[in-house]
């Protein structure tokens, strides 16, 4: 089934070239189908890139999704044209009286800042508070997951001695949780971050369950309140070349950055990346939508 997006959204062309079924809002309005209403709070600087990454995964399920893009009103985005935000995005004030089946809160490259020093922290707190009663399930990604764990459960983040950067092996800890249906016992996922959360802090909270962890990269997947909150501490949505472009960007800036681990063939940045997380990423998003959104949400929001 398709994802319903604006016919002029640039990501639509990218998805169509990959044979991912999209539908315009005009066509969807003629159908007698209750599509799942999903919002993406896009905190990433390169918004169009993140749109394509997430919509690619969301569009690979049997469910019809009505997509809504959100940005922070209290933050000036410098890496995206204002007319793109005006044309395709809403703010929290625009939607605060609505309800959603699902919400995705993305990462943001600001993890070294204390949460309270982030210029849109107060607005983000309002959105996370809103999600408690107006969203069936919220999926938090990377910094968004750290922010959610901190706001909802008081879990702190800790600085790393060096950037966690690469593709790492993870172990499934809970075999019979719906979010992990179909997962191999060991799977790979990308990470790109300067901070981490500790498993010991999560294990102290009764409402949280640690689902997957990496010996090298640490906590990866946490579930709260039986699926009301999902926290993904990595980037299963990343495209095949995302880490490559991050690495090349940092090299050009003169930063002391290591080659992303377990990513390039022969660990040689002149070789092409090895994609080992695509099937897991698709399964993670599909399971979230099926078990924690579609099967839990009321027909009438």
From Swiss-Prot:
Keywords: Acyltransferase, Amino-acid biosynthesis, Cytoplasm, Methionine biosynthesis, Transferase. The active site is at residues 142, 235, 237. Signal peptide: none annotated. It catalyses: L-homoserine + acetyl-CoA = O-acetyl-L-homoserine + CoA. It is found in: Cytoplasm. Transfers an acetyl group from acetyl-CoA to L-homoserine, forming acetyl-L-homoserine. This is Homoserine O-acetyltransferase.
